[in-house]
Amino acid sequence: MSRFLVFALLLAGCQAQPPPAKPLVIRITTGLPGMTFKPLGEALATAFQAVITDARFEVIETAGSVANLQRLESGNADLGFALADVAYTAFNGRGMDFPTAAKNVRALAVLHPSAVHVLVPANSTARSVADLRGRIGVGPAGSGTAVTSALLLNAFGVSPKQITNQSLPFITASDALSAGELEAAFVVAADPVDAVQRATNAGARLIEIGGDQVRRLRVEYPFLRPGFIPGGTYKREPRSIQTMLVDVLLLTRVDLDEELVRRLTSVLFDVLPQLSASHDFLRMMDVRRAPATPIPLHPGAALYYREQELSR
C-alpha cells in the first residue's frame, strides 16, 4: 500500500464526525393554572413522550385559546388547545383578534365540551345575559372566554356602551365578584372549575343561558349547543343550570409532518382511558365526534380516522 493511500485513510479516520441530530421539539401551548388546558397539556405531553421517544415535548403556559391559535399560526407552537368557536373565528379571519385568517392551523380532534358559566352576585337582579350591565369579567385577554362572552353579549343585545369589560384572570374575577367589584363574570371551561367553585362558595350564583337568542346564534355558530351544568356541581346550585356548551379542539399546524400527526392522533386515543381516569372532563369525550371539527383536519389526523373506519 502506498504511503499516500495510508495517509489518506488515516486522514479520513480523523475527520470530525457530524454532531448527532437534535431531537424534534414539539411545543404544546395550553392555558392558565386552575383551568383545564394546562393540566390536560401536561398529561398529553407525558403520554406522547412515553411513546414517541424520538421527539421532546414541551408545555407552554398561555392565556388560552386566542393566544394558542396565534402561536400556532405564527409557527411558535406545534400543538395547542382552543374552543371551537374561537378556532372557527380564527380560521375564517373574523373579529379583532384575527383580522387575517389563520390558514396555517389544522385540527386533530374534538376533545370534550366546555360549559359557559355566567356568574353574578347573590343580590343581583340579573336573570339573563340580556340583563347584564356595568363591570363584566369577560375573561383574560387571549382567552377563549373573551371571544365567547363577546358573542353571547352581542347575541343578547347588550351594547358595549352598557358594560365595562374587565379582562381579568379567572380567580381574580371570582374574588372581584365576591368583593362587589364586578357585576358579572364569564368562565368557559369544563366542570368543575376552581374559579366558579370559589365564587359560588362565596355566595355568587349562576344564571341560565337559553331562548331565541341562542337559537339565532347557533345558525352562524352551530357548534355552540345547548346543555346543562349538572345540579350539585357547585355550592348553592342544587338544580341543573341551562347553558351553552362549546367543544375544545386539539390543534396543530398544517406543515407538521403527516406521519407524526397520525402517530400523535393514534396515541391520543390509545391513552384516552388512562387520561379519563384522572381528568373527569375527558369522560365526556365522544370518540365518534372526534373528527367533526369546524376547521379542516390535518391530513395526518384524517389518515388516522380513515384507518379506523377501514379496520371496523
Predicted regions and their residues:
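Extracytoplasmic small-molecule ligand-binding "clamshell" domains
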Residues: 36-73, 78-80, 236-238
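A structural signal for short loop-to-beta-strand junctions that line the ligand-binding cleft
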Residues: 98-111, 116, 233-242
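Pocket-lining segment of extracytoplasmic ligand-binding domains
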Residues: 84-86, 94-96, 124, 158-250, ...
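C-terminal motif of bacterial Sec signal peptides marking the signal peptidase cleavage site
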Residues: 11-13
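Segments of small-molecule ligand-sensing domains
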Residues: 241-312
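Bilobed "Venus flytrap"/periplasmic-binding protein-like clamshell domains
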Residues: 23-51, 55, 113-179, 291, ...
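Sec-dependent signal peptide recognition
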Residues: 1-7
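Bacterial signal peptide processing site
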Residues: 15-17
